[in-house]
């Protein structure tokens, strides 16, 4: 029954242009933005549905999966995607107080190998994409050591065919597990993250673009593999639109960024 952080930013993206033209939409935009900012957890990150619910007492209850079904802590994916919205659509930058808190939270939660764990997608590719695109949108330097470490990690995970693919076992083991094949959505996430960081196309980016271009008509198991997260080790989602939406977004960002730079 609760409103959703991710759906709210999606709605606000859709309302942005119209909000500049009429008062009613402008009012809806402001209410949505105010609510979004009010939902920032005290630790600086954003949850999915509920604010400040990450109590160690709840996660210690003798209920299977209590840590994932009974709490809604800040996550790298929600925090990164909220930052990406605030930076690209709401004019927020690195020196704004909510952004400063969120950036500090993200940098403190980066894994040793350079990745971030994503709660609502599979898993380290998803979290790293969200974190990097969010950091770039609010003005963090591409040369920042944490950014470069994440880029190195992403590049190392690229498959021989130019794509990326991660197993759902990552979500359960809390450790990156290669799928052994590439998926459209995970390739798009990794590619979009690299595009956000690099001012010009790199060999890894070009190989990723080639993979997405070749796989647009594919219809094998990789296009239906679940890349949405539910309950680690128990529930995963294969969103049918993911194979189209995320590649289209990554390809459009590639076109808009590098075509204008050439």
Please describe what each predicted stretch is.
Residues 1-262:
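Preference for long, amphipathic alpha-helical scaffolds in soluble/luminal domains
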